[in-house]
UniProtKB/Swiss-Prot annotation:
Pfam families xref list: EF-hand_7 (PF13499), Pkinase (PF00069)
Binding site for Ca(2+) 3: D487, D489, S491, E498
PANTHER family named in the record: SERINE/THREONINE-PROTEIN KINASE (PTHR24349)
Catalytic residues of the enzyme: D226
The organism of origin for this protein: Arabidopsis thaliana
GO molecular function: ATP binding; calcium ion binding; protein serine kinase activity; protein serine/threonine kinase activity
Sequence ranges assigned to domain EF-hand in this UniProt record: 402-437, 438-473, 474-509, 510-544
Enzyme Commission identifier(s): 2.7.11.1
Protein name per the record: Calcium-dependent protein kinase 15
Presence of the UniProt keyword Calcium in the record: yes
Main location: membrane
Domain Protein kinase stretches: 102-360
Length: 554
């Protein structure tokens, strides 16, 4: 059973009675799983070791590293296909010849839209994975939108330890290329099978990583929509390798008040409210609950020979805690499974609450603080000169709603009293929810850095300014608009007077600050800032966090 997706409106009875068109190839059984991890027969027999069985030896076919499981959309009416001219761009930036930047290596896997390879960066020798998507296969506007959104979300979530890092997105005349961190380890279930046995404590460690991904996504305003074991890879072959979420092809930004109706996901892991076509971020919690159930007993809780049968079982919602090995599983573990698989999404536990559950907290929680994406961005912002901060504020004011969906949700999550500003306490609590362990002094430093106008709070635009820069600097049009804002007379230069005028408008225009900016940015020492100097300033200090810790992969 691969991913399924539907863009037409069906009733719950349509889905249960089997009138929804299947996206599964006719040469495969309806409940085919993309991995042979789960092939339960009636009665289901565990295909992975459970917490009470220690010697299982399964011969598994080798799994391509970083293989993306491609989604397929199901439509009742055929749409007129899009035909691309070779001169047309999808990503909105100039074509780049990928082979000038990277040397492509062996094929790792292939999906509906393209092929994933290993690749080596020519300038550094670092090794990555390259997912090449053929543009001629993107025959519908929805396909194009999905690819663009996947790139945007991966860039937005960049910097999280449990999420695969994207290096860059490139486009040539034939393909779009996503270059990302190469996970050299196996799939989650492959590691468990190879070990032969594991404990509840080990299962708690795994689900902690999964829930951490969910919590970060939700706090940052993203719904994953396709959580399953196949979409988690180990960063390396090391015993204590980090688990990484790899596929965001079905992910969307959370829109306040929106009810989602698309049927997406993978059959075993799909929440009942998805089948009812009315859902929100809680579907990710359900999927995490299914993963935990499988970790503890070896089979999914809702099983059938067919996809229609699986959906029937999900709607019924009867969970077996009586069969082996459940009598020997702790009550605390079963309690967490029940809370994650609560049928009513409004009553379902959140990721943050699940991470506080005694069964998870009772385990060996990692001592190492997580340097979250938000925190790393704010640290970079703190180190910037005043002109750069001001330029980012100008850019933030010009961004569209589409471009800042996730950040808007994150601001709302931090602004707990809904005042429209973030106080010191709200910033401290918000960063703590993202896993950061900062001292009072460090939080105060970040607060002072983000509070551009110095009024003691961070307003919406200041927050966007301090957090959006990490993944927006390849957008030349934003940088050019910011330059034009300062260059009032359109001379092609920012003069001392123009700089003073703009900085005073934002309460930053003391003489020392202006001289400091000119001295730092004006590299040709002519007393003014040209566009090239401005661009160099905007792009300085932008690095790919975490990359050096795991690359190159040998």
């Amino acid at each position: 059973m691969g991913c399924f997706s539907s863009k037409h409106r069906n009733t719950e009875s349509d889905i249960i009675n089997g009138s929804v068109q299947s996206s599964i190839p006719t040469n495969q059984p309806e409940n085919h799983v993309s991995r042979d991890v789960l092939k339960p027969q009636k009665p289901p027999s565990p295909q992975i070791p459970t917490t009470t069985q220690s010697n299982h030896h399964h011969q598994q076919e080798s799994k391509p590293v970083n293989q993306q499981i491609e989604k397929k959309h199901v439509l009742t009416q055929p749409l007129k296909p899009i035909v691309f001219r070779e001169t047309e761009t999808i990503l909105g930036k100039p074509f780049e010849e990928i082979r000038k930047l990277y040397t492509l290596g062996k094929e790792l896997g292939r999906g509906q839209f393209g092929i994933t390879y290993t690749c080596k960066e020519n300038s550094t020798g670092n090794t990555y994975a390259c997912k090449s998507i053929l543009k001629r296969k993107l025959t519908r506007k929805q396909d194009i939108d999905d690819v663009k959104r996947e790139i945007q979300i991966m860039q937005y979530l960049s910097g999280q330890e449990n999420i695969v890092e994207i290096k860059g997105a490139y486009e040539d005349r034939q393909s779009i290329h996503l270059v990302m961190e190469l996970c050299g380890g196996s799939e989650l279930f492959d590691r468990i099978i190879a070990q032969g046995h594991y404990s509840e404590k080990a299962a708690a460690g795994v689900i902690r990583s999964v829930l951490n991904v969910v919590q970060i996504c939700h706090f940052m305003g993203v719904i994953h929509r396709d959580l399953k074991p196949e979409n988690f890879l180990l960063a390396s072959t090391d015993e204590n390798a980090m688990l990484k979420a790899t596929d965001f092809g079905l992910s969307v930004f959370i829109e306040e008040g929106k009810v989602y109706r698309d049927i997406v996901g993978s059959a075993y892991y799909v929440a009942p409210e998805v089948l009812r076509r009315s859902y929100g971020k809680e579907i990710d919690i359900w999927s995490a609950g299914i993963i935990l159930y499988i970790l503890l007993c070896g089979v999914p809780p809702f099983w059938s020979e067919t996809e229609k049968g699986i959906f029937n079982e999900i709607i019924k919602g009867e969970i077996d805690f009586d069969s082996q090995p459940w009598p020997s599983i702790s009550e605390s573990a079963k309690d967490l499974v029940r809370k994650l698989l609560t049928k009513d999404p409004k009553q379902r536990i959140s990721a943050a609450q699940a991470l506080e559950h005694p069964w998870i907290r009772g385990g060996e929680a990692p001592d190492k603080p997580i340097d979250s994406a938000v925190l790393s961005r704010m640290k970079q912002f703190r180190a910037m000169n005043k002109l750069k901060k001001l330029a980012l504020k100008v850019i933030a004011e010009s961004l569209s709603e589409e471009e800042i969906k996730g950040l808007k949700t994150m601001f709302a999550n931090m602004d707990t009293d809904k005042s429209g500003t973030i106080t010191y306490e709200e910033l401290k609590n918000g960063l703590a929810k993202l896993g950061s362990k900062l001292t009072e002094a460090e939080v105060k430093q970040l607060m002072e850095a983000a509070d551009v106008d110095g009024n003691g709070t961070i307003d919406y635009i200041e927050f966007i300014s301090a957090t959006m820069h990490r993944y927006r600097f390849d957008r030349d049009e934003h940088v050019f608009k910011a330059f034009q804002y300062f260059d009032k007379d359109n001379s092609g230069f920012i003069t001392m007077d123009e700089l003073e005028s703009a900085m005073k408008e934002y309460g930053m225009g003391d003489e020392a600050s202006i001289k400091e900016v000119i001295a730092e940015v004006d590299t040709d020492n002519d007393g003014r800032i040209n566009y090239e100097e401005f661009c160099a300033m905007m792009r300085s200090g932008i690095t790919l966090p975490q990359q050096g810790k795991i690359l190159p992969v040998q």
